[in-house]
Amino acid sequence: MLNVRLWGMMAVVALLLCGCLEVRVVRSPRAVEGKPPPTTVSYDVKMFGARGDGKADDTTAFQRALDAAGKAGGGVVAIPQGEYLIAGHLSVPMAVTLQGTWQAPPSHPGLRDQGAPKPQYGTVLLVTEGRGNAEGEPFISLTHNSTLKGVTVFYPEQDRTKAPEPYPWTVRIRGNNAAVLDVELLNPYRAIDARNAHRHLIRNVHGQPLRMGILVDQVYDIGRIENVHFNPWWSMEKELFDWQMNNGEAFVFGRTDWHYVLNTFCYGYKIGYRFVKTDKGVCNGNFLGIGADDCLVAIQVDQSAPYGLLITNGEFVSFRGTNPTMVAVSETNKGVVRFVNCSYWGPNKQIATISGTGTVGFSDCTFQAWDKDKEGRAAIQVRSGSVLIRGCSFLKDAPQISLGPDVERAVVVGNVFRGKERILNNSTGSVQVGLNAAQ
């Protein structure tokens, strides 16, 4: 018997050494005393009657699957590949994920490849309800700890050659810890409403929102927006794109505390990033690696918090319209705005116009072009408030800075100018200019 066991053990070792036998170690979920081990339950929408043929209305089947997952205490509602017509609305319960096939956001062609097909692969949700009613019920509602992941959302009845029809918000987030991940919102009228949405996570979202991309307001615990790319993949037809350029706003921030925004980009809007005061308050936050290309105004600050908007490693380009400007700080602003290591280029009228009673700072920034029509406009035009401009490069031989009579304080130190120093100082306040190097 002993010899049999030895020979058996030797045979197993030999099989392992030659790779003929595979051993897998599977760890069970950690059990809690008195309870069964936790499991992740998945609900396939097709098991609840969804067709996925782009013709039959799958709203009821989807909601049945979502409700079943919610009733069970949470789970994943899986959407296989297909085109799903949703003629109604969807509500994702607490602790439920509505998940398609995408593990990263798809980006459909448009700006550089007009001929490629529009959404007809992966998981596609076709939305038809709410046409003509921007204030209607949102397409998808998320609540506490619920998630939308891995889908493309498309509005097939929107005409890419005409000014857009209004629709309700595509995604509405309410409550704590909801998420939108790995999603393409191809042609929504308004994409994501994140009001009263504490600790939300919006990550890896692509698309071409027409009127508004993301609205944040009434967020008292830190929200996060990461890797969002709004680009005209769906249409650059003249009537539609002109409308978007004259009406569209990509990112709008009202009251939000300690917001974190990372690696975001938008192209082709009236305003790229807008900071406003609502009845709930104003924004303060950290904005790193953000960009706005071909926006009439890249950043508009109507109001900000006294502890500030901290904008670092930004890239901003404006060139269309009658008065293309990268930064516009309104006379209503009383807060602080700081730009660090940002770059500004494109044939614009001016880099920045600054009003209000707040403080605006530019540190280690690069200003490549301005005064495109040779009107003698300065790159940075400060009309009132306080300004700090330090360690920046002005790469065009043109007026660099103008200070109006209502400027209270200004520090312009340690900059480099192409051509002679041209700083127009009409301020009656305290102004310090020095240690600048002209070519």
Positions of the model-derived regions?
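Extracellular beta-strand/beta-solenoid scaffold signature
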Residues: 120-140, 161-172, 186-193, 208-220, ...
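Leucine-rich solenoid repeat scaffolds
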Residues: 401-439
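Surface-exposed or flexible loop/turn and strand-edge residues in extracellular/cell-surface modules
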Residues: 40, 74, 81, 87, ...
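Bacterial N-terminal signal peptides that target proteins for export
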Residues: 1-8
